[in-house]
């Protein structure tokens, strides 16, 4: 299965081609929010690459959020247009899962099976989007207890208690994690810098058996904003 993958949820813009769960080409820019300019160029380059390799696109995978409102809208509109044009399904992948996959591949964590991976995407001010055991929430970060005592994260869907204890090794990362480093003081909480979601990891997760059957109805699909988008009111005279 050949999947065209898109990741625009943060300031990093990337697109990739994955073949049978293995990334074979990726285009990425880490230097700021230029998604509207870069993404069409990346898509054109990747489609040209697939033609040269004799491949045809079987699906488009998208990092669905949460994240930057503008970035998510750019990625979603591009992905939906490609799906309509190529007549292929859209496979959405949660961005926080993509971030965890990036941490497993890029960081020195060797015991991630027994540790807690705490992905954090910036949600402005002192808020982050994070997830424990699949429960994605926007959380105001004041200290470690903001996470461990959060009512939505204390009990996971299975009914078991929260896995974070005083002795649990916790690794936190993502573009929302740096501002937490100054308020987290436990010695077993470790900040990992420079971990970002990338399109190649979207493809790896999309190829899993679970995701392959979760394509969506294109006409009604919207990105996972989590927090309601509120447009800033203009203060220019004459504009409503």
Locate the predicted segments by residue:
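A general structural signal for well-ordered alpha-helical segments in protein cores
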Residues: 36-40, 79, 199-203
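Acyltransferase
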Residues: 192-240
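Surface "functional belts" at beta-alpha junctions
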Residues: 22, 31-34, 89-197, 225, ...
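Phosphate-handling active-site elements
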Residues: 48-55, 84-93, 108-112, 213
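Stable alpha-helical structural segments in soluble proteins, enriched in small hydrophobic residues
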Residues: 46-50, 85, 103, 199-209
